[in-house]
UniProtKB/Swiss-Prot annotation:
Name of the protein this chain belongs to: Casein kinase I isoform gamma-1
GO MF annotation terms: ATP binding; protein serine kinase activity; protein serine/threonine kinase activity
Source organism of the structure: Xenopus laevis (African clawed frog)
PANTHER family: CASEIN KINASE-RELATED (PTHR11909)
Gene: csnk1g1
Protein kinase domain mapped to chain residues: 44-315
Enzyme class (EC, first level): transferase
Similarity section: Belongs to the protein kinase superfamily. CK1 Ser/Thr protein kinase family. Casein kinase I subfamily.
Presence of the UniProt keyword Acyltransferase in the record: no
Length: 460
């Protein structure tokens, strides 16, 4: 892969903060200054809210030692389903140096909240998909695919499965940064260790598992209640690649009386849609990829090199150059702000202690957590008054389009006038007990914009 932009990055380097505090020190790791400014640790100033979800909210922050902007993810300490520390642990397990992973600068308490400070990244693939009129060219999809196979291979090499594939969880770097053409993977709130840390053996095959992930992209076996493994992450990627090429998937827009029935319909439609039909009018390699990953055994290690080569050879055969000139290059990318992007995806989720929510219908007015309707492009945050995106790193585990929202916190806490770190949550939708779901209008960790109301726009 040739991440084109090798020119010198004239922006300050990512914040090299003090060693990450785990929140177990007796020394307070947050304070409020005399001017009422909230701090996380000794050097991270908490700014305005730029995202929210059932976990809590995401804030823009600044490292006062380096003047670098960061993302600060907040989760109420008394959350009924805390996951931020687990996500932090997974980030540490993945390491801070791998390409395409956000840096984690700090974890510790912040008043009534736990806080995780992360690198700021650019917009998600879903936002860029919107920007490109909801279709990507084959060249762009292949450049994305080759990178994401490598990202998933790396995650798997650290004994983790991701379980939350959706365009909202893959972000480019910030404009003008040397990482701007690299596709990053974020939000490990639904990740799971597939190698038992005690026995060092693969987790056992199980059935009758709750759905975990995003219904639009999840594997067929996940719909069937089978325990997920490496194969399921790769199948979900394949569904996402076809979503980008086609503009929609055959199982979008299905109606049902209950969420459980709807997820059942989505799974049934996936099973009944032949790969040849799903990939019709596109290169055979797309179908070959899906056939391969769907045939993998639960315990089997995928041949990542084979899959990368499949797409790399197609890329070369088409005469493309890996110049990182994606479809969105040259288009005006909006300045980041505090608007909330809502998605039309369908999520059915639980993960032991995590539940997910389903989006409201597109005819239902979607509002951000302040009750003000969101508008596409309503970016009221100027980072240093520069026109580069500074969307926060991990779309909070509860985020938008594909909608896998773990119900991390259900505090529904309202902010007091002087409380700069309140969390909010959405009211749960009643669903069958086997599938915990909550209504989804989730917001990304970075930003969520209300989509254009295209009449042809794809539905859940």
């Amino acid at each position: 892969m040739d991440p084109n932009n090798r020119e010198k990055d004239d922006r300050p380097r990512p914040a090299k903060a003090l060693p990450v505090r785990t929140g177990h020190s007796s020394r307070p790791s947050s304070s409020t200054t005399s001017s009422g400014v909230l701090m996380v640790g000794p050097n991270f100033r908490v700014g305005k809210k730029i995202g929210c979800g059932n976990f809590g909210e995401l804030r823009l922050g600044k490292n006062l030692y380096t003047n670098e902007y960061v993302a600060i993810k907040l989760e109420p300490i008394k959350s009924r389903a805390p996951q931020l520390h687990l996500e932090y642990r997974f980030y540490k397990q993945l390491g801070n140096t791998a390409e395409g992973l956000p840096q984690v600068f700090y974890f510790g308490p912040c008043g009534k909240y736990n806080a995780m400070v992360l690198e700021l990244l650019g917009p998600s693939l879903e936002d860029l998909f919107d920007l490109c009129d909801r279709t990507f060219t084959l060249k762009t999809v292949l450049m994305i695919a080759i990178q994401l196979i490598s990202r998933m291979e790396y995650v798997h090499s650290k004994n983790l499965i991701y379980r939350d594939v959706k365009p909202e969880n893959f972000l480019i770097g910030r404009q003008g940064n040397k990482k701007e053409h690299i596709i990053h993977i974020i939000d490990f709130g639904l990740a799971k260790e597939y190698i038992d840390p005690e026995t060092k053996k693969h987790i056992p095959y199980r059935e009758h598992k709750s759905l975990t992930g995003t219904a639009r992209y999840m594997s067929i076996n996940t719909h069937l209640g089978k325990e997920q493994s490496r194969r399921d992450d790769l199948e979900a990627l394949g569904h996402m690649f076809m979503y980008f090429l086609r503009g929609s998937l055959p199982w979008q827009g299905l109606k049902a009386d209950t969420l459980k029935e709807r997820y059942q319909k989505i799974g049934d439609t996936k099973r009944n849609t032949p790969v040849e039909v799903l990939c019709e009018n596109f290169p055979e390699e797309m179908a070959t990829y899906l056939r391969y990953v769907r045939r993998l055994d639960f315990f089997e290690k995928p041949d990542y090199d084979y899959l990368r080569t499949l797409f790399s050879e197609l890329f070369e055969r088409k005469g493309y150059t890996f110049d990182c000139v994606y479809d969105w290059v040259g288009r005006p990318i909006p300045t980041p702000g505090g608007s909330v992007h809502v998605d039309s995806g369908t999520s059915a989720i639980t993960r032991e202690s995590h539940a997910h929510r389903e989006r409201p219908s597109q005819t239902q007015p979607l509002r951000n957590q302040t009750g003000v309707p969101d508008r596409r492009g309503a970016w009221d945050l100027q980072v240093g008054r520069q026109a580069h995106p500074a969307y926060l790193v991990p779309h909070l585990a509860s985020d938008r389009h594909g909608g896998s929202v773990q119900v991390m916190s259900s505090t529904n806490g309202q902010l007091n006038a002087d409380d700069q770190t309140g969390g909010h949550s959405n009211a749960p939708i009643t669903a069958q007990a086997e599938v915990e779901v909550v209504e989804e209008a989730k917001c990304c960790c970075f930003f969520k914009r209300k989509r254009k109301n295209h009449s042809q726009r794809h539905h859940k």
